[in-house]
UniProtKB/Swiss-Prot annotation:
Protein name per its UniProtKB record: Elongation factor 4
Organism: Rickettsia canadensis (strain McKiel)
Cellular compartments per GO CC: plasma membrane
InterPro entries xrefs: EF-4, EFG_III/V, EFG_V-like, EFTu-like_2, G_TR_CS, LepA_C_sf, LepA_CTD, LepA_IV
The protein's role, per its UniProt record: Required for accurate and efficient protein synthesis under certain stress conditions. May act as a fidelity factor of the translation reaction, by catalyzing a one-codon backward translocation of tRNAs on improperly translocated ribosomes. Back-translocation proceeds from a post-translocation (POST) complex to a pre-translocation (PRE) complex, thus giving elongation factor G a second chance to translocate the tRNAs correctly. Binds to ribosomes in a GTP-dependent manner.
Pfam hit, one: GTP_EFTU_D2
Subcellular location: Cell inner membrane
NCBIfam families recorded: lepA, small_GTP
Residues annotated for GTP binding in this entry: 17-22, 134-137
Keywords assigned: Cell inner membrane, Cell membrane, GTP-binding, Hydrolase, Membrane, Nucleotide-binding, Protein biosynthesis
Similarity comment text for this entry: Belongs to the TRAFAC class translation factor GTPase superfamily. Classic translation factor GTPase family. LepA subfamily.
Amino acid sequence: MNNQKYIRNFSIIAHIDHGKSTLADRLIEHCGGFQAREMSKQVLDSMDIEKERGITIKAQTVKLLYKAKDGNTYYLNLMDTPGHVDFAYEVSRSLAACEGSLLVVDSTQGVEAQTLANVYKAIENNHEIVPVLNKIDLPASEPEHVKQQIEDIIGIDASEALLISAKSGIGIDLVLEAIVNKLPPPKESSDDILKALLVDSWYDPYLGVVILVRIIDGALRKNMRIKMMATNSVYKVEHVGYFTPKKHIADVLYAGEIGFFTASIKQVADCKVGDTITDEKKPCEQALPGFKPNLPVVFCGFYPTDSSEFEYLKDSLAKLHLNDSSFEYEMESSSALGVGFRCGFLGLLHLEIIQERLSREFDLDLITTAPSVIYKIYMRDGESLEIYNPADLPNLQKIESIEEPWIKAIIIVPDEFLGAVLSLCTEKRGVQLDHSYIANRARIVYKLPLNEIVYDFYDRLKSCSKGYASFEWQMDVYAPSELVKLGILVNGKAVDALSTIVHRSRAEQTGRALCVRLKDLIPIQQIDIVIQASIGSRIIARETIKALRKDVLSKCYGGDITRKRKLLEKQKIGKKRMRQYGNIEIPQSAFIAALKIGDE
């Protein structure tokens, strides 16, 4: 099959919970991809976490055969993309593999921030966009109001928006006809030389790495020798095929088609999303535009609660890395926590997913240190560094300036919660860039330091807006800031795992809050425990946990006073020795407390 006018490559753009995966399920069911008895909810979401959280993490594709009302049979390639900001680059590459998009909006909720970000990416990729209003069978549905929102905010004509209910199957045939009639076919291939876009990849224990591709020019055949243009790696293609969503093996993928291939590739890290694949013997002259390496932006430490589990943690991280090359890790040691790993993530959701998979799939109990970001350090001697571990920050006297990453955030929030959201953004050192109204909701654009976002911003935003605010962000610039390293000392010894980098204006407040929290969490011992917060050599906050007093005179019922003095002196010498050699046991809850100072 190589008649491109009967191919439609499309994706579904939607905010979380607006019905993207449910609509995909209905389309698969309607086109006979699965029999009714084989259907399960969210067919394309393969991980348990994806189904439970209602999110899509890995891009998935499905090839459907649809006999349209014009009598022709069409091949519909549905690309189910991640919707969350952490996976924004994967979304942009998945959209680059398609010519059109269905914009699904919940008719009871309206346009959300995440919808905006992804629809703008689709417009950048010159997509034809078909608006679809979902959940029209609910009493709270307001289709006319939401149509107006789509026109006002996004600027596309929504007068002919499709009214559907993915859950009950209303209007699914209208969606399929719109895909055929309104979305364009792939452009005719201008060249016989293979040029393909690498959309996604994952690890299969039997086949090695499976690569999802969109063929732009030429054809991809079994036994062909191919070259990855970003890494110059060469492989021999072993299997070629497509998903319906079951795996089907074919001999060839032609221009305009989306499918998969395997080539005995050992690790996902060798397959860069957005890379161009070409023929080794007759390579194409230019790679496809838009490729960039996926770099982590949030870092934190993972330490096993039991040091004997270190090797198991190492193996578990290696297995996760097979399937997710955007997650990075390296070994590090801490005087307080022992040996663990410093891990890099695309964002906070990505961090949570990896943490949850380690707990669920590998049954690991971990201590997680406070998240941090990459800081650029410019030294007085002209040297420049990039650090993501607060313990690595050099002496402040040697530093000329420190730059931190700032983000551009779009927040859409109902009017009644606007004041609380503006206060939160101001507290987080935000700078307002834009403020506009959409019916009874406000759209605000802020510039915020990423350091302030990674702790508790999202939770507090949801809390102060009762869950109604939606939040979308993208990396903006690095800018100089008055940053300092806030260290924590317990009985004069620095606890590196509790050190954080904070803005100078917030250092004292944060230090006091952390000392108070630690005072409540560290158990009372037989000696005084002094908890201090410091900036360099200056102590800015202190709390003392008074010693548990052991009454050594309880058995002295009178008698010579010198006997009592001797016992008290012996106790004093013992306590001095404990202070000198005794290690204070800091419980796991104390490290978790470092993440939650903002809740005070």
